[in-house]
Swiss-Prot record:
The keyword Protease does not apply. Belongs to the complex I subunit 1 family. One of its GO terms (molecular function) is oxidoreductase activity, acting on NAD(P)H, quinone or similar compound as acceptor. It comes from the Bacteria. It comes from Paraburkholderia phymatum (strain DSM 17167 / CIP 108236 / LMG 21445 / STM815). One of its GO terms (biological process) is aerobic respiration. Its main location: membrane. The chain crosses the membrane at residues 25-45, 91-111, 126-146, 170-190, 205-225, 257-277, 290-310, 330-350. It catalyses: a quinone + NADH + 5 H(+)(in) = a quinol + NAD(+) + 4 H(+)(out). This is NADH-quinone oxidoreductase subunit H. The keyword Transport does not apply.
């Protein structure tokens, strides 16, 4: 009996019919706290890594090696006043940051951390993740409109157009994964990558989807960078053009919620990419399978997050027209063609996903 099964059995004996509700709330709270800690230290890792790339030390003053810097940043934001513009629509202005951050948390309901460790193991998990992650754009649009600022509204319109453009390509990339796995359950998609000729010979990483579905993987990950408005696709909040975009009139914790949502979405994109294309919690080689699956998933997510940061430190920002051209004239045709190619591949005698 696993640790979770033991806790579940003991809780049922103590609380009876109330235990399932209590256990669900405990799991949600634990996941939320872990996500918040991950975001805090992801920001520190980003500042450290970019500092090293710039031949600097990065934050190193607060605590040993700067490890308490995230706590200092949170305290600073908590103590700042949320100043509301006089011409702003009060309630919409305050609700918009919440509408951005809630979907970012809600996606984690279906993301499995290892076999059996998921808040909600639903069959349409992939569809749920795509749908709920698309809702955040409404909060961005409302933030730009409610601020009653032309710069904020321009940033919000850019965000809406950019997110819609890249969601189409991202959706087709995920359709390819669904076709090969034959399911939308995220746990089953990971299981489908642990079978095949290479996996039977102990070389599991060659059975992962990244190899046969490489174009879809590249399109998904780059579209994920654009979806999160990260550099080099950060024209939504282009500092040299419209300052902070839709967040220009926000301060204090209201401003922090937008950044919280951005970094949570970075982790979501990396986690989904790891699950859909990099085998999730499976070890790259059979002889390493003694290491807990959650360790492998965390390592893969950390690697992809580091790529996010590396791209920010090395690439110049695209112009808005270049971003739209990349989404509609490059990524969309590539993913549509790849859907057709994989469809014929599955129907042919060379099908490797049987």
């Amino acid at each position: 009996m696993t640790l979770f099964e033991s806790i579940n059995a003991g809780g049922t004996q103590i609380l009876g019919v109330a235990w399932p509700t209590v256990w669900a709330l405990v799991r949600i709270l634990v996941v939320a706290v872990v996500i918040l800690l991950c975001v805090a230290y992801l920001i520190l890792w980003e500042r450290k890594l970019i500092g090293w790339m710039h031949v600097r030390l990065g934050p190193n003053r607060v605590g040993p090696a700067g490890l308490l810097q995230p706590i200092a940043d949170v305290l600073k934001l908590l103590l700042k006043e949320v100043i509301q513009p006089t011409q702003a629509s009060r309630w919409v202005y305050l609700v918009a940051p919440v509408m951005v951050v809630v979907p970012a948390f809600a996606v984690w309901a279906v993301i499995p951390f290892q076999a059996g460790a998921v808040l909600g193991d639903i069959n349409a998990g992939l569809l749920y993740a795509i749908s709920i992650s698309s809702v955040g754009v409404y909060g961005v649009i409302l933030a730009g409109w409610a601020s009653n600022s032309k710069y904020a509204f321009l940033g919000a319109m850019r965000a809406a157009a950019q997110m819609v453009s890249y969601e189409v390509s991202m959706g087709f990339a995920l359709v390819v994964v669904m076709m090969t796995a034959g399911t939308m359950n995220l746990s089953d998609i990971v299981g489908s990558q642990m079978r095949g000729i290479f996996a039977s010979h102990g070389v599991t990483f060659l059975s992962w989807n990244w190899l046969p579905l490489l174009p879809a993987f590249v399109v998904y990950f780059v579209s994920g960078i654009a979806e999160t408005n990260r550099h080099p696709f950060d024209v939504v909040e282009g500092e040299s053009e419209i300052v902070a975009g839709h967040m220009i009139d926000y301060s204090g914790m209201a401003f922090a919620l937008f950044f919280l949502a951005e970094y949570i979405n970075m982790i979501v994109i990396s986690a989904l990419a790891s699950i859909l294309f990099l085998g999730g919690w499976s070890a790259p080689f059979e002889f390493l399978s003694f290491i807990p699956g959650i360790v492998w998933l965390v390592l893969k997510v950390f690697l992809l997050l580091s790529v996010f940061i590396w791209v920010r430190a090395t690439f110049p920002r695209y112009r808005y027209d270049q971003i739209m051209r990349l989404g509609w004239k490059v990524f969309l045709p590539v993913t549509v063609i790849w859907v057709v190619v994989v469809g014929f591949w599955i129907m042919s005698p060379l099908n490797i996903w049987n």
